């Protein structure tokens, strides 16, 4: 994305659950980044909204979308902040309701439950970031809250990362350890390594290049026949 001399590049690592945001300009500038979330509070599922989830047209009375956990914490980098966010499924999910509804509680323990203890989320982090507070707004008829960050000083280059992690764990602490391991891979010394990011970007580009090199569609159809007919008429054949 380019505008007024600023280039913003977003790319996802195909081998690791990390999204990178790179901002480049010919002159030093400050950059801001916001994490926006409409699930910052519990929300009762209203009539007709069951279609957004597995309950469909018959959600149990009182069913709600529970709030995500969102917390500001210190990064390993001096004076820098990062945002931890995640959603952990409630003790009872649609899996439990469906099993009971079908009268299968006796064999419930034998079933694979893909929703139990499932936690997903990540870190939003960057180089030399300061926290500038929250703001509330509305998008598509739904209110949301934004957590804002700004670079501590102007620079020609800025880099932000969103490190993600999804896992079924007995405790949140175990899930957080998995997330920290994923983050430490790109920040082995407590600071995001430009060398690691550069290597990951190169490998991602090579993967996409190989993908497109093996993805061809060759067609023979009406357009080609018309072109052949045109050539025949011009040559008098």
Model regions and ranges:
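Acidic/polar, glycine-enriched structural segments that form the non-catalytic walls/loops
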Residues: 1-237
